[in-house]
Regions:
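Soluble extramembrane regions of membrane proteins in the secretory/endomembrane system
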Residues: 27-247
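C-terminal segment of classical bacterial N-terminal signal peptides
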Residues: 17-27
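Bacterial N-terminal signal peptides that target proteins for export
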Residues: 2-13
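Residue-level detector of solvent-exposed, low-hydrophobicity positions
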Residues: 14-16, 246
Length: 247
């Protein structure tokens, strides 16, 4: 079962994202878009300012020359953000390029095969999928039920998840707390599962044979899982059990 302190960390990321989306509209020099249905920033539209968008459905195909703060039930970013991205909602999709850092909380975030994050990724929620071809140039900090990495993290990945699958590349270290493969169906994140979320994968750690970890893999779990690590990290592997009272 996912450790309580990391469940709280995920909730903290979700709360911080929600509060930012909720109150940032009070800041001056900020363009605001909103509506009850769908708000679209067209492909040929360029916004030379920070932008706040809130709607049930949000699609950003254009260019934001500033920070983008967006909240909605379904959010898709296909365009370019030349600042940082703060994104909260249920079903989130990033297919474009973000020059800065991505701060995101929601039921699910999918980072598409052409997506690029210029700095760091912070995510809290149920499911994060980084597809083959995606790039996070610096670090990834993830707290949730599952993280499936098919793309690349340039530096370190710090993860607390019931399930962690690495099939892509991590340039630095992987520091992870992962669930027990025997704990199928025993997750504190069950209440977050909503329509549109990806299927739940089996708990535990899995490193595929095509994966690359340039640094050290350090993982904490109730049980050691050597058979699930099918690629040798450059810095070796360290396993440890949870400290008493952290579950």
């Amino acid at each position: 079962m996912l450790h309580k302190k990391y469940f709280r960390l995920a909730l903290a990321i979700l709360l911080a994202t929600a509060l930012t989306v909720g109150v940032v509209g009070q800041v001056a020099a900020l363009e605001i878009r909103g509506g009850e249905g769908t708000v679209t920033i067209a492909q040929n539209e360029v916004i030379d300012d920070d932008l706040l968008v809130g709607a049930q459905n949000v699609v950003v195909d254009g260019t934001i020359n500033g920070d983008l703060i967006v909240g909605g039930t379904n959010v898709t970013i296909n365009g370019t953000v030349n600042g940082s991205l703060i994104m909260g909602g249920q079903v989130l999709n990033l297919n474009g390029k973000v020059a800065g850092t991505v701060y995101s909380g929601g039921t699910s975030l999918t980072i598409g095969p052409k997506a690029e994050i210029g700095r760091n990724l912070f995510y809290g929620g149920f499911s994060l999928t980084a597809e083959d071809g995606s790039l996070i140039k610096r670090d990834a900090l993830v707290a949730g039920y599952q993280f499936v990495l098919g793309g690349e993290v340039g530096r370190d990945a710090r993860v607390s998840a019931g399930a962690l699958e690495i099939n892509g590349k991590v340039g630095g270290d992987v520091i992870a707390e992962v669930g027990n493969p025997a704990d199928v169906g025993q997750t504190s994140f069950m209440p977050f599962v909503v329509p549109g979320a990806p299927p739940m994968v089996q708990p535990g750690l899995r490193v595929g044979p095509e994966a690359t970890i340039g640094g050290k893999l350090t993982y904490t779990s109730q049980v050691e899982q050597p058979g699930a690590i099918r690629a040798q990290p450059g810095g070796g592997i360290a396993f440890q059990t949870p400290m008493p009272g952290t579950q």
